[in-house]
Amino acid sequence: MSLLTDSLNQIQTWLETNYPLAAESITPGLTLSEIESKIETLPFSLPEEFYELYQWSRGNSLNTKTIYTDIFSADDATSLNSLEYAMEVFPDFVDEDEDCAVNYIGKPLFPIFGSDATFHCIVGDWEDKTPSPIVYVSEIIETNHSYVNLTSMMLTAAESIQAKAIDFNTKTYKNWNEEKYAEIYFKHNSNILELSV
């Protein structure tokens, strides 16, 4: 089992024990052929971690309250998008006539987590030997690195909730241990500062 799937399973197990209602928002995954058929019109390839994530969970509709909103951040860019929604909004990222057109070092971005205005994206056509970074796109079209890659994002989440570095029940970080969270974040994203957009 990969570190990505293992960390996702850790999150699910923790939620089933501590917040069973939240765990119910985790949808079943798609098969590889279902994923491929939903994104077949994409003009670029996506990294292996993308397929692994969607085989674990198919995501949720935009209006569904999910675990991701409470685990990762106080912002709205943390709900795992269904592929239907991601495919609906991604053309805005690549259409140069759109105000929200954006890319990462000349490569396309695909919105895997998000809301109607802010997104966490994976990089398309990523050919580096390392996994794709996760890039945050704000509603004012600024980009910055959120996580070194998708695995580091989930490792950060799993360890943070298990160590009680974040209070899962809050909508903001009023009840979080900033020092402990930062320690966990930089443990799994130690070279984040080396990356630049």
Name the predicted role of every residue range:
Residues M1-A117, F186-V197:
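A surface-exposed partner-binding patch
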Residues H120-W126:
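Short, surface-exposed beta-strand/loop micro-motifs that present aromatic residues
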Residues L15-N18, A22, A157, I161, ...:
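Short, flexible helical or helix-coil boundary motifs
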Residues Y136, T143-A163:
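Compact, glycine/acidic-enriched structural inserts
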Residues T130-S138:
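Intrinsically disordered, low-complexity regulatory segments enriched in Ser/Thr/Pro
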